[in-house]
Structure formats: C-alpha cells, structure tokens
C-alpha cells in the first residue's frame, strides 16, 4: 500500500522540508526545464516518468526522486494521472 498523505508529510517534515502537493491528469506533460534548487519529490498516486539526459525514471506510488540543481528534465504523466508531493532544498 502506498504511503498516505500524512505519512509523506511527516517524512518531509523530518527532513526539514515544506511539502507542496500537486496532481495532473493522464498524459499531461512538462517541457524541458531545470531548477536552481534541489527538488525532492514523492509519488503518492498514479505514475509519472521524468526524462533526463541520462535516461527516463518512472515513479509509482511510494517512489522518491531527488533532482539536483541545474539538472535538465521533462516529465510525462501516466495513464491514471498522478498525485505527488515535493519540496525544495537549498
């Protein structure tokens, strides 16, 4: 069973992070971009595939992805949509 919203909020809080929840519909996409901060992201429901210059990473419920500052990435939401929680570090 995937972690609940409360469990994921607690994980972020323990790391000193401020969680922000978001979701997208099936097939939604994010174009190539980067951030000036370290992004910490958990998938809570559905799936999303992050595309990087090093290859693709698919996240499913309970999976975590850390994206270092300056890393170029794009994303495609899976067939069931997605709900994620993320925060920035630094």
Map each language-model feature to its residues:
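Short, charged/polar surface micro-motifs in flexible loops or helix N-caps
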Residues: 26-27, 45-48, 90
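A generic "binding-loop/recognition-motif" signal
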Residues: 26, 36-37, 55, 71-72, ...
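Conserved short histidine dyad/triad with adjacent acidic residue
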Residues: 18-35, 69
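Ligand-binding loop in jelly-roll beta-barrel domains
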Residues: 70-90
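Short, conserved beta-strand element in jelly-roll/cupin
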Residues: 34-49
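Short acidic-glycine-tyrosine-enriched beta hairpin
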Residues: 53-69
């Amino acid at each position: 069973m995937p972690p609940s919203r409360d469990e994921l909020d607690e994980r972020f809080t323990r790391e000193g992070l401020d969680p922000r929840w978001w979701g997208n519909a099936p097939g939604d996409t994010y174009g190539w971009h980067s951030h000036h901060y370290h992004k910490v992201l958990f998938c809570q429901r559905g799936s999303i595939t992050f595309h990087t210059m090093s290859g693709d990473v698919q996240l499913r419920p309970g999976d975590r992805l850390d994206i270092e500052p300056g890393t170029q990435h794009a994303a495609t939401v899976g067939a069931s949509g997605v709900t994620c929680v993320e925060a920035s570090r630094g």
